[in-house]
Amino acid sequence: MSTGGPQKLEAQGGKEGKEWDDGAEHDGVTKIYVAAGGLGIEQIRFDYVKNGQPKEGSFHGVKGRSTISTIEISHPAEYLISMEGWYDSTNIIQGIQFKSNKHTSQYFGYEFLGDGTQFSLQVNDNKIISFHGFADSHLNSVGAYFAPISSSLTTTPNKVEAQGGNGGETFDDGVFDHVRKVYVGQGESGVAYVKFEYEKDGKRETRDHGKMTLLGTEEFEVDSDDYITSIEVSVDKVFGYNSEIVTALVFKTSKGTTSPPFGMVTEKKFELKDGNGGKLAGFHGKASDVLYALGAYFAPSTTSTTPSTTKKLQARGGNGGASWDDGVFDGVRKILVGQGNDGVAFVTFEYNKGSQAILGDGHGKKTLLGTETFELDYPSEYITSVEGYYDKIFGVEAEVVTSLMFKTNKRTSQPFGMTAGEHFELKEDGYKVVGFHGKAGDLVHQIGVHIVPIFTNYRVAI
């Protein structure tokens, strides 16, 4: 291994076509364009940053009638660490997938089913800074240049001082990748309790502080493609406490969403915000039986590598239960639906991410009636629409989902539940379902979907 400069990994695939080389003088990759067609990957292009300046790359291959999909990488906090794929006897790249230090892209082209040659471009403790290969009418091969991951890429989060009083015990949740949900519980005089749902390396973690009262909690959920940019903290001196306490919280996001005020807004307000436009990454402060003070960590904002064509269709049903969101995957493998006496009591979904089958969390509550399963012939089969009904049932304040039915590119499932009430359909022509979200308590109150364009082709043995 050379230590004097970038390391060049040999191109994988066929050597047909014209050799291309984007050069090894870049700092990193900022954008990827991929067109996948009937015979494999038709065309690819990479944009770079060089000496801090953006540099557009060239297209390699020829795009037919396929759609170009893009991946954006937020340099320098995010960088590519690997590219995986495969090619067959035609010596054309059939499928590829990219991984960064923060995300894994959707799979482009045909997924590997065992007939062909797989490859992986990766060097430990290095990042991809450029690509090379061969291409003609299609992408025949691809290789990469690697450089060590500079310590300068590791940015120190900005810790914004806690605002409020001096009472209570100090807490510090630390720094996470995302803040997904905030729960705020009121007391008689101010904010008595907070709970934060974080995400780090794809896993959810919660931290709570203060003491919950009989008033319960209110919640503010952040969409998967959004993040909190500021928190307004109201504080006041309240009878019975030796120092000021937090009386209200208001959250604002990068997409312009503002939460309702959680608590009593006062004239004395502070704003927790990063001067560099960063995103909220964690909380610290002081609490005991109430929240005395709140501060925050902010980290550089990053752009998700989920293709920008991903859409989130609004959930349908009643406004009950707690919000949930499984996020975006490559596809759906299996659906389990559990019935209750009056509606859908429980759902869980098995997804595919890269080469892994991932079982999502259960939503709702299983009953003695058990669950029914709808299994897809993944990857050649995918969900194109979700239909169902929701209705008001005795003893439950908000409407519940009473029936679900799933349509794929090959067939339609049986109806799970009772087809009564208000009908709905979650569908967009030319798109497939790659994730679910909704609301649930003891029953499923709402169901919604994440969708992406159907541009991936799957090879099926005949």
Curated annotation (Swiss-Prot):
Tissue-level expression reads: Expressed exclusively in flowers, in male and female organs, petals and pedicels. Not detected in pollen grains or sepals.
Q: Which cysteines are joined by disulfide bonds?
A: none
SUPFAM superfamilies, A to Z:
Mannose-binding lectins (SSF51101)
- What triggers expression? Up-regulated by methyl jasmonate.
Q: Does the keyword Lipoprotein apply?
A: no
Q: Does the keyword Protease apply?
A: no
Q: Name one GO cellular component term.
A: nucleus
Q: Which GO terms describe its biological process?
A: defense response
Instruction: Outline the segment boundaries, as ranges, of region: Disordered.
Output: 1-23
| Span of domain Jacalin-type lectin | 6-148, 157-300, 310-453
What keywords are annotated for this sequence in UniProt?
Lectin, Repeat
For molecular function, the Gene Ontology terms on record are: carbohydrate binding
Record's CDD domains? Jacalin
Biased amino acid composition, Basic and acidic residues: 13-23
* One family name in Pfam for this protein: Jacalin
Q: Sorted alphabetically, which PANTHER family does this protein's record hold? A: JACALIN-RELATED LECTIN 12-RELATED, JACALIN-RELATED LECTIN 3
Name the protein family.
Belongs to the jacalin lectin family.
- What name does UniProt use for this protein? Myrosinase-binding protein 1
According to its UniProt entry, this protein's organism is Arabidopsis thaliana (Mouse-ear cress)
Lineage of the source organism? Eukaryota, Viridiplantae, Streptophyta, Embryophyta, Tracheophyta
